[in-house]
Amino acid sequence: MRFRSRNYINSWGRFFWFAAFIVSTFVLFNGFSYSNFRFLFGARFEPVLKFARKTPTANAIVSGEHPVTQILSVRETVLLPDQVILFLKYPRSARLFTKEELECVYLSVHNPSPVPWLKQSPARVDTEQLSEQIVRCPSGPRGLLITVGSKLNGVFPAGPTHHWDSLAYEALVDNDNTTVVFVKGLNLRLERVFNASRFECVYGEDFSRLKLVLRSEVLSIAQEIVRCRTPLIVLNSKKKVNSSVKVSVRIKGGGTLPSIARLGFLSDSGRDPLPTRKPHETCICTMARNQARFLKEWVMYHALIGVQRWYIYDNNSDDDTDQVIESLFNAGYNISRHIWPWVKTQEGGFSHCALRAKGSCEWIGFIDVDEFLHLPSGLFLHDVISNLTSITTSFGNISIGEIRVSCYSFGPSGLKRIPKQGVTVGYTCRLVVPERHKSIVKPEALNSTLINIVHHFHLRDDFRFIDVDRRMMVVNHYKYQVWEVLKQKFYRRVATYVADWKDEQNVGSKDRAPGLGTRAVEPVDWSSRFCEVTDTGLKDRVLQNFANPKNSLLPWQTTSNKKARPWFVEEKNTSKVQEKEYRLL
């Protein structure tokens, strides 16, 4: 009997330890598998949303006292200086809410009640993809949790909240299969390459558990751009991780930047980055905020001198910019709007644009909407570029990767209201000496760090830049327009390393309007300032070549939905397909 009792005890002991081993193994395996094995072996890989606090709204959608079926989730929330950006994710079959149906909801962090402390209408709602939206809400009082709701469905659960001053916010896989990560918070110096060995890139769902993320080498780091070696498992699972895997940057021995940067892949990623023939000879990229009333003239004019493709990075516009771009696209212009809500990131936006344009554009210019390329010779832009690069290379036996064009700064020219015929005709008085330059670059010539200071990029060692003779090409920069337009520059400057005009910092910068100080107060003599020489070169050419001879209207003054072309042209058939060769007068 004693022997049987001892065996009974030993059996239960062995069973206990066996059961404990099975349970611990299951827990370990289960925790590891969701962040690694499911990713590695191609199973569905989804982000885990963590709520800032546990309240009834964080676990169910609240409509009065009764929860309703979840229609959307707030994937991420970013607190910008003067507004809040919320990224919404819908089920694939769900109907997306309109701006009128959504509300910005502000909940008390300390009060567990689901009753909203405040509700406001969103400033804007943009559809990014078929099942995703970007909602811009006004900043609320401190200490409030911000989410969205609808009048019919109640309040939706809040998503994880991030502060803008420390964040990885965008990520693209380049043609060479490296990952380019765009970050805020490293505070690196302008135009300096930093020691990459002090950092590493991390890929995964939850960066608070470093044992469960993939790590990779940082190849270069400069300003706010980090280039990483992409893990092979990420490249091989491209289709599965496109909207799931996030990327961030970790300081070795320190912390990891919070991240909302989900991997994006270029359409030609992994292919030859230098195709024999690209679709477009000349393209233009810009970053703009509330430039709807000037965008039509800017696009149409540059189309008439030979630009074929436009990339518009919309930096939190709340005017009709999206509608103007849509109308231009419908009229036949190859133009796209890229939502770029990130404040003071013009350098990063231009680098992002250069990556996107690499497979499509032989040359791409980076200019603002108040800047117009003027070709005094009457040639088209691609002809000027071809002449510049062929002449230089025949003598120097080097490759030209960047063309730098001098900028003439125009003043109000005696006007007090926005000119009806457009800026190219209305403003005719400027400063004598050029201010700075802008660049037209060959995307594959850019240094891998993608360093730029808005006006030009750093190039690879086997490429050089050239300065263009102002008799061949200049930029007419309508910098100091009528006060109604000029005062908008006091809102915020878009460049990272440029102080806002309202700040006392760097008051003497060339970016500012001399003599204005830090307050948007119109000087009595504003309309006559910055006028040292009369220059009607571009005005004359625009009126001669682009005005309708019947009514003298310019293309951007009409409501036509057809693509504009010069009124005076020479036409000839060059192949079986009817083609036209235009020559400006």
Residue ranges and their predicted role:
Residues 1-135, 139:
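Long, charged/polar, low-complexity intrinsically disordered N-terminal extensions
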Residues 2-44, 128-136, 141-166, 172, ...:
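Catalytic-site signature of metal-activated, phosphate-bearing donor transferases
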Residues 87-95, 182-191, 233:
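Short amphipathic, basic-aromatic surface patches that mediate peripheral association
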Residues 98-109, 196-206, 301:
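Short alpha-helical elements within RNA-binding folds
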Residues 269-285, 320-366, 374-380:
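Active-site-proximal specificity loops/subdomain of glycosyltransferases
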Residues 286-300, 316:
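Active-site beta-to-alpha loop of glycosyltransferases that engages the nucleotide-sugar donor
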Residues 300-308:
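Short, acidic, metal-binding catalytic loop of nucleotide-sugar glycosyltransferases
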Residues 308-316, 338-339:
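Short beta-strand/loop segment that forms part of the nucleotide-sugar
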